[in-house]
Regions:
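Glycine- and acidic-residue-biased ligand/ion/polar-headgroup-sensing regions
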Residues: 64-76, 80-81
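A short, N-terminal "cap"/entry segment at the start of jelly-roll beta-barrel domains
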Residues: 1-43
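Conserved short histidine dyad/triad with adjacent acidic residue
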Residues: 45-62, 96
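A short hydrophobic beta-strand segment most commonly corresponding to one strand
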Residues: 67, 93, 107-119
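Short beta-strand His + acidic residue motifs that chelate non-heme Fe in jelly-roll/DSBH
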Residues: 58-59, 77-78, 94, 99-106
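Short acidic-glycine-tyrosine-enriched beta hairpin
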Residues: 81-97
C-alpha cells in the first residue's frame, strides 16, 4: 500500500494544449501531476491534469477505456456526436477507441483525475 500526497507530486507542463472552438484569449496551457509514477502499477496509469481557461486535450483516442473524475472547475467533454459540461464530482467513462477531447471552458479552469490501463 502507498499513500500519495498530491501536494508533494511535481507539476509537469504538457507540451500541447488545444484551445476550445472560438477561443480568443491567447495561448492555452495544461499541466500534469503523475499520481502513479511510470511503472508503479502493472495495470493502471493515473494523473491529475490541470487545464487553464480555454485549454483542451484536442481530439485523441486511447487503447483502453478512460475514467475522468472532475476535481475542480468547470469543463467540457466531447466525442464525435456530442459535447457535455462537467463539474466537480462528475465522472466520465470514455470507451476504448472512442475519439474525444476534454478540457476547460473559456470562463473556468478545470482539473480531473485520469485513469487508463497501463500499456
Amino acid at each position: 500500500m502507498r499513500v500519495i500526497r498530491i501536494a508533494e507530486v511535481d507539476i509537469v507542463p504538457i507540451d500541447t494544449a488545444t484551445p476550445i472552438p472560438g477561443w480568443t484569449g491567447g495561448p492555452v496551457r495544461r499541466t500534469r501531476q503523475p499520481i502513479l509514477p511510470e511503472g508503479a502499477s502493472k495495470h493502471f496509469n493515473s494523473s491529475i491534469v490541470n487545464f487553464e481557461k480555454g485549454a483542451t486535450t484536442g481530439w485523441h483516442v486511447h487503447k483502453s477505456d478512460q475514467i475522468l473524475v472532475i476535481t475542480a472547475g468547470v469543463g467540457m467533454v466531447a466525442n464525435e456526436n456530442e459535447e457535455q459540461e462537467v463539474t466537480v464530482g462528475d465522472v466520465v467513462h470514455i470507451l476504448e477507441g472512442e475519439t474525444h477531447w476534454h478540457g476547460a471552458k473559456k470562463e473556468s479552469y478545470m482539473s480531473h483525475i485520469t485513469i487508463t490501463a497501463a500499456e
